[in-house]
């Protein structure tokens, strides 16, 4: 479990460094929808980019906010944008209201890094088998979130 957490931390750090290099105003040319994101992350690589999706559900767990592309986070087709509660708070200020309610059933564009993450009970995800992975897009700043 320690190796998994170390690899996840390293991948998250790499994605944060990649995001820091991007301005909040920069929108990369290639925009990935949830199906593209699932396909691009099959090799368990970190995929930085611009992602477009409609938020169908919002979950909060361990001070993290998950914006889901599917009604259930257990759906294997789900791609979740993961942001910290601090980023969600900054998004509340930026968009002038309760960000979690504002994005529900709306199309969003985010700049971040996507990767497959092994599902485990510590993350609050029910494990179906040992090859169970979920796809997350890590976004580190509210300025990297755009409503459409």
Q: What feature does the model see in each segment?
A:
Residues 1-8:
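Bacterial N-terminal signal peptides that target proteins for export
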Residues 8, 12-16:
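Hydrophobic helical h-region of N-terminal Sec-dependent signal peptides
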Residues 20-21:
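C-terminal motif of bacterial Sec signal peptides marking the signal peptidase cleavage site
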Residues 24-148:
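OB-fold single-stranded nucleic acid-binding module
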């Amino acid at each position: 479990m320690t190796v998994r957490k170390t690899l996840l931390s390293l991948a998250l750090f790499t994605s944060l460094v990649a995001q820091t290099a991007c301005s909040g105003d920069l929108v990369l040319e290639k925009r990935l929808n949830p199906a593209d994101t699932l396909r691009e992350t099959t090799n368990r690589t970190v995929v930085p980019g611009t992602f477009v999706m409609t938020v169908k559900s919002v979950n909060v767990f361990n001070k993290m906010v998950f914006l889901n592309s599917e009604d259930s986070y257990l759906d294997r087709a789900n791609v979740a944008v993961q942001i910290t509660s601090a980023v969600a708070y900054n998004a509340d200020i930026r968009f002038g209201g309760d960000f979690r309610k504002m994005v529900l059933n709306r199309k969003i564009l985010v700049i971040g890094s996507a990767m497959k993450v092994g599902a485990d009970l510590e993350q609050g995800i029910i494990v179906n088998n040992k090859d169970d992975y979920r796809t997350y897009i890590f976004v580190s700043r509210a300025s990297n979130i755009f409503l459409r």
